Amino acid sequence: MTLALRYKRVLLKVSGEALMGEQSFGIDVSVADRIASDIAEVRKMGVEVAIVIGGGNIFRGVAVASHGGDRVTGDHMGMLATAINSLALRTSLTKLGVETVVLSAITMPQICESFSQRKAMSYMNQGKVVIFAGGTGNPFFTTDSAATLRAAEIGADVLLKGTQVDGIYSADPKINSTAKRFDQLTHVEILRLGLSIMDTTAVTLARENNIPIIVYSIHEKGGLTKVLNGTGRFTVVSE
């Protein structure tokens, strides 16, 4: 059985930094378009797709706290950054004819709909791509935690994390050339080894809800399809 058949509904986590491309800030529209093209390709395979995007290309809440500011306000600013990125990716998907809706954990009715689990499930059952903005809607939680939470809420078969590298390493391979790459890990091993691919809350939530995680490079065109076909280069996290 192929991974495409095993994974009918997926939650894709995309970092905000992935949208920057070669820029140092903001959104590279050509990168957003390429990511959207990969998503459109897997939709044609019949895979239901939901997405959570980070906001680090625009703002990080911890930046405020590190300079003596209020962390809660900083995190709220970060949530708004995820909304900007979500609208950008929706625009790229819409250009390809992919019906897409943005649901936000923080209310902004003039811009997008508010999140509810029932609404998200309804849209996914209609074949629409659903993008979750605003993180969890609460400060002190990362968008990785938001992605795991939404994956649990919609009953996703797997959490796919598109990153800057092709899997999970013992250290940043761009800095440490001797970093060990893992093909397979358990949630417990990630926690025990202190691997920084996701925060502890996200990994624990995935483990408690039996959600496997696949980590792959978001930068390879067609990489998402390869992952779902089981032919790509990635790391699988499961019990």
Swiss-Prot record:
Pathway linked to the protein: Pyrimidine metabolism; CTP biosynthesis via de novo pathway; UDP from UMP (UMPK route): step 1/1
CDD domains in alphabetical order: AAK_UMPK-PyrH-Ec (cd04254)
Pfam families, alphabetized: AA_kinase (PF00696)
Protein origin, superkingdom: Bacteria
Keyword Cytoplasm among UniProt keywords: yes
Positions of ATP binding: 13-16, 56, 60, 163-164, 169, 172
EC number of the protein: 2.7.4.22
GO MF annotations, alphabetized: ATP binding; UMP kinase activity
Sorted UniProt keywords: ATP-binding, Cytoplasm, Kinase, Nucleotide-binding, Pyrimidine biosynthesis, Transferase
Quaternary structure and partners: Homohexamer.
Name of the featured protein: Uridylate kinase
